[in-house]
Every structure is written in structure tokens, then in C-alpha cells.
Design a protein with these regions (language model features):
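Short gly/ser-rich loop at a beta-strand->alpha-helix junction or flexible surface loop bordering the NTP-binding
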Residues: 1-159, 194, 271-277
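Surface segments flanking catalytic/ligand-binding clefts of nucleic-acid enzymes
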Residues: 8-10, 136-277
């Protein structure tokens, strides 16, 4: 059940006041959800819109636009000139240009490009890149769309940071870990890898890599180690790639805590393939 206005539900007879208090919990004043409903970033955003009727922004806009992997515990974000907002909602007094808001399921929110602009300029790269990657993945916008918003707001806080960030984003990432892995490689001076490389004849896709040098990099999450069928398929898949002349570097979550090891392994494979790194 989606968030709803408690007093309206009682007035309509859909709920009694006692039923409202027993089975539902308030996220914001007079905005309720069922006690058994897990609070996601989207649920929090929907509740914030009901509580304020103000345009959603930042991670809240990203949530209603379909972005995955968002932290559900972050405060909701809205845009309001007077910056007045209930507790646990952050209000921004940003000036929006015409065309920088859209309607999503009946709610006002910043457009995908404007949302990416705000996420990219206000967060450090290791936070912003996974967020913007996920937003691009969900909406299909391109870095050029975000750059166009930046050009319309040359004096906005964090624009220089955003411009430096955009060459590092890629909507092909299918998890925050893939985004962080790619960021580690690019920050180390390696050429930006292509994401989601498909081998149609082999029916295989790899997370990222370089066609020119036939080097692939795979992020292996927990399921790659815990699931027997997945592990067996991974072994077969790597063998097929190697038979096709590709070198594959596999990276685990633990290895991401040792980025220098990841970088040197990938660099070594690229050098062996003739890449001048």
C-alpha cells in the first residue's frame, strides 16, 4: 500500500482512527504507510510529496524516476523557496529553469537531467558516480543532457565538480559496485572501459572491458561465490572468453577495499595486450 493522508482516509470511512493508529505508521505528519511495508527511497519520496506538495529533488527525484540501489534511510529532498520542511525532509531553495521539472505518477519532480546535475554537483565522486550511473541506467539520458543543464546554470554551486565528474559516469553500470570498480580504474589513469560488452555468438556479456585489447573486468558479487549454479556457469564463461582470446580479471567486494591490487592486475593484462599504460 502506498503512502496516504491519514485524515483523508478517516474522513472517507476507509479507516477508523483506531485502525489507522494500530496498523499504520506515520512517516511525516498525517502521511502514513502500513506498518509491514518496507520503507524504500521511493516510498519515502512519495510520502514527502504528500506531506509538502513540493517538487521532489535529489535522491527523492531519482527514486520516483526509477533509480535503483538508493539508500532508503536518507532524508527526502524537495525544492521550496522558503526552505521550510517537516523534520526528516531536506528543502533546497534552488532556482529551476523552465522545463526542469516533470510529472511522475502525479508527483512533481526534477527532470532526469536536472536530477543528475544536482546529484553530481553536490556529492563527492565516489558517491555521485554510482548515483548518476544508476539514474542514467534507469532513464536513458546521456551525460550530454546533464552538461546542457550545467551550461544553463554556470554559477551554481558545484558546477566545476560536476563537469569533472561527467567523463567518469556511464549508464551501463548495473550495480553500485560496478560503478565503484570502474571509478577505481579510471582514477588510476587507465582508459575508460566500455560497459556491458556482449558476445552474441557466445551468449555472454561482461561487466566492462576493452575490445581493442581484449581485456575484460568482472565484478563478482556474493551470488557468484555462494550460488553453485552461478559459480559453475562463471567457470564455463571464463573458459569460453579465454578460448576467444580474452583475458579476464575478476574482482570481489573484498578486493575493492584494496584498489591498488585491482589496478595493477588490470594494468598488467592491458600491457600484455599492447595497451600503453
Amino acid at each position: 500500500m502506498e503512502p496516504f493522508i491519514g485524515s483523508a482516509a478517516v474522513r472517507s470511512g476507509a479507516l477508523t482512527r483506531r485502525g489507522l493508529q494500530r496498523k499504520y505508521t506515520a512517516l511525516y505528519r498525517d502521511v502514513y504507510i502500513h506498518r509491514d511495508l518496507a520503507v524504500t527511497a521511493r516510498i519515502r519520496a512519495e510520502a514527502a510529496w504528500l506531506a509538502t506538495r513540493a517538487p521532489l529533488a535529489g535522491t527523492s527525484a531519482a527514486a520516483v524516476l526509477g533509480t535503483l540501489w538508493l539508500n532508503p534511510d536518507l532524508p527526502a529532498e524537495i525544492i521550496r523557496a522558503d526552505r521550510h520542511a517537516p523534520p526528516r525532509i531536506v528543502a533546497h531553495s534552488w532556482t529551476l529553469a523552465p522545463g526542469e521539472t516533470c510529472m511522475v505518477a502525479g508527483m512533481d519532480a526534477t527532470t532526469p537531467a536536472r536530477t543528475a546535475f544536482d546529484l553530481g554537483r553536490l556529492h563527492r565522486a565516489d558517491v555521485a558516480v554510482p548515483l548518476v550511473d544508476a539514474l542514467l541506467n534507469a532513464t536513458g539520458i546521456k551525460p550530454a543532457d546533464v552538461l546542457a543543464v550545467a551550461e544553463a546554470h554556470p554559477g551554481a554551486r558545484g558546477v566545476a565538480r560536476l563537469r569533472a565528474l561527467l567523463p567518469m559516469v556511464d549508464g551501463g553500470a548495473e550495480s553500485p559496485q560496478e560503478s565503484r570498480l570502474r571509478l577505481v580504474l579510471v582514477r588510476a589513469g587507465l582508459p575508460a572501459p566500455q560497459t556491458q560488452i556482449e558476445f552474441r555468438d557466445l551468449r555472454i556479456r561482461v561487466d566492462m572491458g576493452w575490445w581493442e585489447w581484449r581485456v575484460a573486468v568482472e565484478y563478482d558479487g556474493v551470488q557468484h561465490w555462494a550460488d553453485r549454479r552461478q559459480r559453475s556457469w562463471d567457470i564455463d564463461r571464463i573458459a569460453l572468453l579465454e578460448e576467444a582470446g580474452w583475458a579476464v580479471v575478476r574482482v570481489s567486494a573484498e578486493m575493492l577495499s584494496r584498489p591498488h591490487v585491482v589496478v595493477e592486475r588490470v594494468r598488467a593484462k592491458l600491457r600484455m595486450a599492447g595497451c600503453p599504460v
